[in-house]
Design a protein with these regions (language model features):
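Predominantly a Rossmann-like dinucleotide-binding segment in NAD(P)-dependent oxidoreductases
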Residues: 126, 133-218, 222-237, 241-259, ...
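Hydrophobic residues in well-ordered beta-strands that form the structural core
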Residues: 63, 102, 127-129, 158
């Protein structure tokens, strides 16, 4: 697959947003900066969010997903609601004849994923699952280097990241394993997407361990997994979200969102949480920092590097490749060189590239519904493996095509 650069188009795609929470807040700088899309409609139960949305974007506001999907100003529905609602909202969008961009995890069960894929197929619309960090330009560039054949085939992939994920502000559902809480479903999707893309083959099985060692956050906060692929490639995945060591140190002190890391913020998530008296205060504090809240956080920056998801190393037959926020390090037989990338003009622009290429040019998206379902299958298998202490075979996998540059 050649990386897509959509044809110019005279009219921006109208994006209807379901869920004006944190995921939307993170995507907002992209929607604002990219002229190929415009925010045309929104749906959220919080009055303060919809009021600001209407005022800021002169957009329509709806009270149901079905009404938003019927809005003629909407071409694409961005499903950024909590994961337990993804299937219902994506299906409503497809039935309304709208293309779907849905946040990860795609859903909470494979049956839900299949129903989303079926609805999109029946309606003749595209489903794209993202943003995930497999969209990041350094990851895609690494895929291009692999596809060139210069460094031989990939044989082993290592991915690891240490964050404060578990101690960021959370809703009660996010701390309930029965409702999909924990890092495996919510952060594992990033790493699984990345290693599947880099391996370029179908995953066949997974073995995982999960860590849960803080009673105040009673969900999995860490994991280690080994994923096997057809052709003998294997990948190790490690993630820890307890807010001590910061994995951004291994990425040039650039944060996950591509911003310069402020070392004074070490431990900030734990300090903020410790200042709150109970779960109700935590929910209120989270809402205040989301779109429309009194303390809304801006993620826009004029000094951006590429986004990342921690340390990733691909061991090929003749070199190790390491994607970084400013390019890809190539550790070859006789020298180490940087394959540089220019800084991004727009954060997460690759998501809009893929979306516009699908809608305008009919190019099959890389991160389609079947891709998202395969990633969820691996994540669910990681949970099963950790619980049952055994390898779990995978049955719904799809392989990524080789990604080449022009």
């Amino acid at each position: 697959m050649t990386l897509v650069h959509p044809s110019p188009h005279p009219r921006a795609l109208g994006v209807g947003v379901i869920g004006l929470g944190r995921a939307f807040t993170l995507m907002l700088p992209t929607f604002i900066a990219d002229p190929r899309v415009r925010l045309s409609a929104g749906f959220d139960p919080r009055d303060e969010a919809t009021a600001r949305f209407t005022a800021e974007f002169k957009a329509n506001v709806h009270t149901t997903a079905e009404a938003l999907a019927a809005d003629p100003a909407v071409d694409v529905v961005y499903v950024a609601s909590p994961a337990e609602h993804h299937a219902a909202h994506a299906i409503a969008a497809a039935k309304g004849g709208k293309h779907v961009l849905v946040e990860k995890p795609m859903a909470q069960s494979l049956a839900e994923c299949q129903s989303m894929v079926d609805a999109a197929d029946q309606a003749g619309v595209h489903v794209i699952v993202g943003h995930s960090h497999s969209f990041d330009r350094p990851i895609l560039r690494t895929c291009e280097l692999i596809a060139s054949g210069v460094y031989g085939a990939p044989k082993m992939i290592a991915a690891q990241y240490y964050t404060d994920f578990l101690f960021r502000l959370r809703r009660p559902a996010e701390l309930d394993p029965a409702q999909g809480g924990g890092v495996i479903l919510n952060q594992g999707a990033h790493q699984v997407d990345i290693v599947r893309l880099l391996a370029g083959a179908k995953a066949t099985s997974v073995r995982a361990l999960a860590g849960r060692w803080d009673a105040t956050r009673p969900v999995d906060g860490a994991y280690a997994a080994l994923v096997n692929f057809e052709g003998g490639v294997f990948a190790s995945l490690l993630y820890q979200g307890y807010g001590h060591f910061d994995g951004d140190e291994l990425c040039g002190d650039v944060t996950e969102l591509g911003q310069r890391r402020d070392r004074r913020q070490q431990g900030a998530a734990r300090r903020r949480l410790a200042s709150l008296a109970n779960a109700s205060e935590e929910v209120a504090a989270k809402a205040a920092r989301n779109y429309g809240g009194a303390e809304q956080v801006s993620y826009a920056s004029d000094d951006l590097a590429h986004q990342h998801f921690g340390l990733v190393v691909v061991s090929c037959e003749r070199a190790d490749l390491r994607p970084l926020p400013n390019g890809v390090m190539v550790y070859a037989d006789s020298e180490a060189t940087l394959d540089p990338l220019p800084p991004p003009r727009i954060p997460r622009v690759e998501v809009i590239d893929e979306l516009c290429a699908a809608v305008w040019d009919g190019k099959p998206p890389l991160h389609d519904g079947r891709w998202g379902m395969a990633t969820l299958e691996v994540c669910l298998a990681m949970l099963d493996s950790a619980r049952e202490n055994r390898d779990i075979a995978l049955h719904r996998q799809v392989a990524a095509p080789a990604i080449t540059s022009h």
